[in-house]
Each structure stands twice: as structure tokens, then as C-alpha cells.
Amino acid sequence: RRVLFRSMIAVMDENGNQIHGNCKPTSELPMHTETYTIRDDIGGVVHCHPPYLTAYALANKDVETRAYPEMMGNFCKFECAPYGRPGTDKILAGAIPILQNKRDIVLLGNHGVLVVGKTVTDAMNKTEAAEAIAKALFLTAQLGGEVPLSDEECQFFLDLQKTK
């Protein structure tokens, strides 16, 4: 495992010119830059491959629950977009409608996850929360599956999410 230093982060301007960092930008830079144009409230983008969210992405499975109030109240569900080849405009194509539907977390089929927020820190915090939720749900499945809450209780948390 390598240590990430500030000098290793490729910082780009709005024209795609590198203004900081000594590492080459990712081949997925167009995905990052185009994501900012999808919604006015997007001010930060995180794309990564955390193990549990990536496992769901590799299985092309949405992450959803009827048992975990914290997920229902904060995120509703994490939808999985169809596969698109990394490094091409196809990787974002399936995620665009999900992001346009005010979802902040999108699994990229057979690849990883794309998370947006008001800032990069906000997007990173959502990424960490989403990975913890995916891990809990994955482990719950290993124990025989979740015990769902009542329809009324689920609706309470889904309504709570709509007010955020």
C-alpha cells in the first residue's frame, strides 16, 4: 500500500490543464470533468474502488435495504449504472440519468463508484458512509439476510430522505 502525498494529486483547471501535482491525471479525467456539468449543486467528485461498493458494482447489483434506517434516511439506495468502458465517454453514460435524478452515489457497473457532493470533502464523506453501509449489508447477507422493517417504518425514512 502506497502513501498518497499532496504532491501526487493531479489538480486540473476548468480547461483540463494540470496546475498542481507531479503525477499524470487519470485517463478518466473526462468523466470527472463532465460530472460537474450534470447538476448545478455538484462541487466535488470522488471516483474510487472501495472493496464492498466495488463488489456490488462487479455484480451489477443496486445497494438497497428495508432494514437499515441510516441508509434509507440518508441515501435511499445506490443504483448501479450499466457497464461503460473506463477511459471513454461510455463510463459516465449510464450514470448520468441516475445523477440527474438527484442521486449522489452511483455504482459504475463492473468498475467502481462515482460520488458527488457540494465539495470534495462532502463527496469523500459520502463515499466513506456508503462503503460502511455496503459492508454492513454484505455481512448481513452472510448471516442469512436482513430483517426488514414494516412498510410504515420504511416509508418514514424514505420521506425523511426526500426532505434533505
Please identify what each model-predicted range represents.
Residues 1-164:
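Glycine-rich flexible loops
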